[in-house]
Design a protein with these regions (language model features):
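FAD-dependent oxidoreductase catalytic-site/capping-region signature
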Residues: 14-211
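Metal-dependent nuclease catalytic cores in nucleic-acid-processing enzymes
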Residues: 4
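Predominantly flavin-linked oxidoreductase catalytic cores and closely associated redox partners
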Residues: 1
Length: 211
């Protein structure tokens, strides 16, 4: 979720001015401090989408910046981003080889939000973010909900928008299943079925996200 803000300076403001870029560069060069010395997310939180849950199922990554998509320039307006991750998604995708050529790209179908439970959590996460942002002292600085937009109110609208703006957090697991069935990639010794001398020893063999 992206919110436009007022009376505060975000990285968007620095990035779109030459003086701002110089200030960021000098601060790091002279003091090893400032935006260039930090991770993008300055604030985090673990929360429950349902109070009845024993442990949190959502994780917040809040950044003092906003952008259209990863790799693109920051927005020209002042804003912050509250990214929410579903820690235990139910949706399941596929990764399939497309050729005997080891350099050929695989076909990846993530099927995000294909499970009803994930769609429910997505809508709850946006509503929870709105509730947090509506509280003082944040509320006095927020001028507009840029994404998904205040006009999106129903669960159906929020879920549809979540599908449009959602992205991975770059830590995929479970893409090379361990087991002995036809869908398994490795056995219990991490050896790849049908290929000698090859093992997979990372989180891709884990059946579920360890969070």
């Amino acid at each position: 979720t992206i919110y436009k803000v007022k009376n505060v300076r975000t990285l968007n403001d620095f990035a779109h001015k030459l003086t701002g870029k110089i200030q960021i560069g000098l601060e790091y060069l002279l003091n090893r401090s400032g935006p260039m010395s930090m991770a993008p997310s300055q604030l985090g939180a673990f929360v429950r989408s349902d109070p009845a849950m024993a442990t949190p199922d959502l994780q917040y990554h809040v950044q003092p910046l906003s952008l259209p998509a990863f790799g693109e320039p920051l927005h020209s307006f002042s804003a912050f981003t509250a990214s929410v991750c579903n820690l235990r998604p139910h949706s399941r995708g596929t990764v399939q080889i497309t050729s005997a050529d080891p350099f050929a790209k695989p076909h990846i179908a993530p099927h995000y939000l294909s499970a009803e439970a994930d769609r429910v959590v997505a809508a709850k996460a946006i509503r929870m973010t709105r509730k947090i942002v509506s509280q003082a002292p944040l509320a006095e600085h927020v001028t507009d909900e840029f994404l998904p937009g205040a006009d999106h109110q129903s669960d159906e609208e929020l879920i549809a928008k979540a599908g449009d703006i959602s992205t991975t957090i770059f830590h995929p697991v479970g893409t090379a299943k361990m087991g002995n069935d036809s869908q398994a990639v490795v056995n219990d010794r991490l050896k790849v079925h049908g290929i000698s001398g090859l093992r997979v020893a990372d989180a891709s063999v884990m059946p579920t996200i360890t969070s």
